[in-house]
Design a protein with these regions (language model features):
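Non-catalytic accessory regions of SAM-dependent methyltransferases
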Residues: 1-41, 45-48
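Conserved hydrophobic residues forming the short capping helix/wall of the S-adenosyl-L-methionine
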Residues: 12, 107, 163, 235, ...
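Residue-level signal for inorganic ion chemistry
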Residues: 28, 66, 96, 132, ...
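Conserved AdoMet
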Residues: 30-106
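Active-site beta-alpha loop architecture of Rossmann-like, nucleotide-cofactor-dependent enzymes
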Residues: 70, 196-199, 252
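Conserved SAM/SAH cofactor-binding pocket of Class I
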Residues: 98-203, 230
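Mobile active-site "lid"/loop adjacent to the S-adenosyl-L-methionine
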Residues: 195-227
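Conserved Class I SAM-dependent methyltransferase catalytic core
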Residues: 221-286
Length: 289
């Protein structure tokens, strides 16, 4: 095995189990330095210069202290592309990629049925790193109007950098989902709001609790649907005719979120399972009768 890989692996073994240390070592080399796994196996990794060694040791030092890889290298993969990531925003998850796929497919089908006219209007409520809004803007070839909200100025700064990085046309606004109602309607409302209850903290990994923004993760035990009530009201008031709302949810409450959408007048409400077999998404539509 390559000498640099072994150096990284040995450093990470001081904190992680063998299997996780190995996976992280491969990911660090590929995502942090552009070294593919095949090059490691073939022992064709070029020697690191002084600057690369310094950066590597800085990253390893942070990871040995518990910093997640994505924060240590400053970026995370999402749908095969890199997005700037720091502790002001959540690290994008694979499940959220599925939410983007769902929304992108619906948007294209909606436009095809619509047959032209005004651009599609998309709202990403609680954008974080901006990955959902940016990917949807790119899927629509920057021909849709995409607006993205977050209550955190720090998160919005990261999201704007990511939009510039990817050449995506997104309008970012500081908005509180719980206390704001826009004046105009949207064809698609998408959101991945906080949905983990305080009681679930005990089951979570230390690196998530210690480094990821709690405001983007947790909701009170006595009000787990806090953000979904606001989103349901938003959809009731501002979802365009034939439009759709799609949200990521806690698997324990997906059915309740779908019922909440139905109670607010939406049609074709349903839950959708993720790649791990969990009920992870809830959708609803504003059907014209």
């Amino acid at each position: 095995m390559n000498e640099i890989f072994q150096y990284i692996y040995n450093a990470l073994r001081r904190r992680y189990e063998a299997g996780e240390a190995r996976a992280l070592a491969f990911a660090l080399l590929e995502d942090g330095f552009g070294v593919e796994r095949t090059a490691v196996y073939a022992d064709k990794v070029s020697n690191f210069g002084d600057a690369e060694h310094k950066r590597l040791n800085d990253i390893l030092s942070r990871m040995e202290n518990g910093t997640p890889l994505q924060y240590a290298i400053g970026k995370a993969r999402f749908r095969g592309e890199f997005f700037k990531t720091n502790p002001a925003v959540l690290i994008p998850r694979p499940e959220t990629e599925e939410l983007v796929e769902l929304c992108a497919a619906w948007s294209k089908d909606y436009l095809k049925k619509k047959g032209g006219g005004a651009p599609l209007r998309i709202l990403d409520a609680g954008t974080g790193s901006g990955c959902i809004a940016i990917c949807l803007a790119k899927e629509m070839e920057n021909k849709a109007y995409v607006e993205a909200w977050d209550i955190s100025e720090e998160a919005l700064a990261v999201a704007k950098e990511n939009a510039d990085l990817h050449g995506a046309k997104v309008i970012f606004k500081k908005r509180d989902i719980l206390n704001f109602m826009p004046e105009t309607a949207f064809d698609l409302i998408v959101s991945n709001p906080p949905y983990i209850t305080d009681d679930e903290r005990k089951d979570m990994e230390a690196h998530v609790l210690d480094y990821e923004p709690h405001a983007a993760l947790f909701v009170p035990n006595d009000d787990p649907l806090l953000f979904y009530h606001a989103l349901a009201k938003l959809a009731k008031e501002r979802l365009a005719p034939e439009g759709m709302i799609a949200v990521e949810t806690n698997r324990m409450f997906a059915d309740e979120v779908a019922r909440l959408f139905e109670e607010n007048g939406l049609e074709e409400t349903q839950t959708i399972t993720d790649c791990f077999g969990n009920k992870r998404f809830a959708v609803g539509r504003n059907i014209l009768l």
